[in-house]
UniProtKB/Swiss-Prot annotation:
It comes from Homo sapiens (Human). This is Large ribosomal subunit protein uL1. SUPFAM superfamilies: Ribosomal protein L1. Component of the large ribosomal subunit. Its main location: cytoplasm. There is a cross-link at K118, K161 (Glycyl lysine isopeptide (Lys-Gly) (interchain with G-Cter in SUMO2)). The gene is RPL10A. Component of the large ribosomal subunit. The ribosome is a large ribonucleoprotein complex responsible for the synthesis of proteins in the cell. PROSITE patterns: RIBOSOMAL_L1. One of its GO terms (cellular component) is cytosolic large ribosomal subunit. The keyword Phosphoprotein applies. Keywords: Acetylation, Cytoplasm, Isopeptide bond, Phosphoprotein, Ribonucleoprotein, Ribosomal protein, Ubl conjugation. It holds the Pfam family Ribosomal_L1.
Length: 217
C-alpha cells in the first residue's frame, strides 16, 4: 500500500467492516464501498477526471451484463447463459425512450458486437449513453465469459461537481485479503488520477451498506 495508509490500518478497518457485519445478518449481500473526500480541488476549474481500474475480485457478484450481439455472439451467449439481444430485438424498441430507459435500468452494463456498436445510437437513440451505460466492444477473438468477468470486476472513478466519490470495492462475503487487495488497487489508482496525488485526498473511508464507516486516511 502507498505509505499513506498503513497495512495495519487497512486490515483493521477491513476486519471491522467484514466481521462487525456478522453481528447482524442481512437478507441481502452488502456491498463494501470506498468513500473518498477530496480537497484543494475546484470542480469548476480543475480537470474532472475519470478512469477505470480492474480489481482482482469481483466487487459486485450480482452485477448483470447484457450482450447486444450479432448472430454468432447471440449463439455464444445463449450457450453460456449470458443475457443477450440481437439487432431485431433492439429495433423493436423503436427508439421509445421509456423502453430504452427500462433496458438501461435492467442491466448494469452492456457489451456489443462490432457490427452493432456503431448502429446503437441510430437504433436506440442516446438512452444508454445518458445512463452512462454505452456498451463496450466485444470482438470475435475475445472469450465472452472472460470479457463479462472483466466488466464485472472493473470499477469507474468519475469526478462530478462535488468533492466526494464512492465506488464499490467488494462485498461482505469476501476474505480479508481479497478485500484488502481490492481496496489497495482502488486507492492507488484513484490517487494516480489526482492532480496533486495524496495532497488532494481529505479522507478515505470504507463501509458496508448497513455498517459504520471506518476511516483509512
Amino acid at each position: 500500500m502507498s505509505s499513506k495508509v498503513s497495512r495495519d490500518t487497512l486490515y483493521e478497518a477491513v476486519r471491522e467492516v467484514l466481521h462487525g457485519n456478522q453481528r447482524k445478518r442481512r437478507k441481502f449481500l452488502e456491498t463494501v464501498e470506498l468513500q473518498i473526500s477530496l480537497k484543494n480541488y475546484d470542480p469548476q476549474k480543475d480537470k474532472r477526471f475519470s478512469g477505470t481500474v480492474r480489481l482482482k475480485s469481483t466487487p459486485r457478484p450480482k452485477f448483470s451484463v447484457c450482450v447486444l450481439g450479432d448472430q454468432q455472439h447471440c449463439d455464444e451467449a445463449k450457450a453460456v447463459d449470458i443475457p443477450h439481444m440481437d439487432i431485431e430485438a433492439l429495433k423493436k424498441l423503436n427508439k421509445n425512450k421509456k423502453l430504452v430507459k427500462k433496458l438501461a435500468k435492467k442491466y448494469d452494463a452492456f457489451l456489443a458486437s462490432e457490427s452493432l456498436i456503431k448502429q446503437i445510437p441510430r437504433i436506440l437513440g442516446p438512452g444508454l449513453n445518458k445512463a452512462g451505460k454505452f456498451p463496450s466492444l466485444l470482438t470475435h477473438n475475445e472469450n465472452m465469459v472472460a470479457k463479462v468477468d472483466e466488466v464485472k470486476s472493473t470499477i469507474k472513478f468519475q469526478m462530478k461537481k462535488v468533492l466526494c466519490l464512492a465506488v464499490a470495492v467488494g462485498h461482505v462475503k469476501m476474505t480479508d485479503d481479497e478485500l484488502v487487495y481490492n481496496i489497495h488497487l482502488a486507492v492507488n489508482f484513484l490517487v494516480s488520477l489526482l492532480k496533486k496525488n495524496w495532497q488532494n485526498v481529505r479522507a478515505l473511508y470504507i463501509k458496508s451498506t448497513m455498517g459504520k464507516p471506518q476511516r483509512l486516511y
